[in-house]
A protein has these predicted regions:
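Short, conserved beta-strand element in jelly-roll/cupin
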Residues: 26-48, 84, 105-108, 113, ...
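Histidine- and/or cysteine-centered catalytic micro-motif in compact active-site loops
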Residues: 21-23, 42-46, 58-60, 68, ...
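Aromatic-acidic/polar surface patches that form glycan- and anion
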Residues: 7, 32, 98, 102-107, ...
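Double-stranded beta-helix
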Residues: 48-118
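Non-heme Fe(II)/2-oxoglutarate
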Residues: 68-72, 108-113, 117-168
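Conserved double-stranded beta-helix
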Residues: 1-55
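Short histidine-centered beta-strand/loop micro-motifs
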Residues: 17-20, 25-30, 104-105, 123-127, ...
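Short edge-strand/loop segments of extracellular domains
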Residues: 8-10, 56-63, 137-144
Length: 168
């Protein structure tokens, strides 16, 4: 479905607010169901103090929809700071109390596989230690992207690949 690098330089790496990737992929890419997984591979050490990815284990069982239409070209700003499609503080608090919060830490080369619908986010990196991860996202060939559910047009192909041909 997509590949991206998340780079958080030392002292100025911006965090990413709590969200479910599937909510965006459903609303803006037209992904019908949460039949995708992400693999985050640490390119640098991921410490508890340099903006490491936080996840709420088990939260993938609950879909938290965003209300309303997605603004045109939302992807131009949402990949830096997501403001549309994020859950309310009440929903986040409820999920955190029910599921807890774990953090992905480890040396470069460590990997975390997680469900497309899991609630996750990261804090700012105010340390001198950069944190970089590559994300590889795999969607089921039986879950081909359709027209977006809440956007006027799909995101560009370089953000959300629409070819559902199986890899051979």
């Amino acid at each position: 479905h997509q590949t991206r690098i998340n780079y958080m330089p030392g002292f100025k790496g911006s965090g990413f607010y709590w969200h479910s990737d599937f909510e965006t992929w459903h609303a803006e890419d037209g992904m019908p169901a949460p039949r995708a997984v992400s693999c985050s591979i640490a390119l640098t050490p991921n410490f508890a103090y340099n903006g490491g990815l936080m996840v709420m284990p088990g939260s993938h069982r609950t879909f938290v929809p965003s209300l309303g239409e997605t603004p045109e070209d939302n992807h131009k700003s949402s990949l830096k700071e997501q403001k549309i499609g994020v859950p309310s503080e009440e929903v986040i608090a409820d999920m955190a109390h029910r599921h807890g919060i774990d953090q992905f830490t480890g040396p470069a080369g460590s990997a975390l596989w997680f469900d497309a619908n899991i609630m996750h986010g990261s804090g700012n990196n105010i340390t001198p230690f950069p944190r970089s991860n590559i994300f590889l996202v795999f969607n089921s060939v039986d879950n081909a992207l359709q027209d977006p559910y809440a956007a006027t047009a799909p995101r560009p192909d370089y953000i959300a690949h629409r070819n559902a041909e199986p890899l051979r």
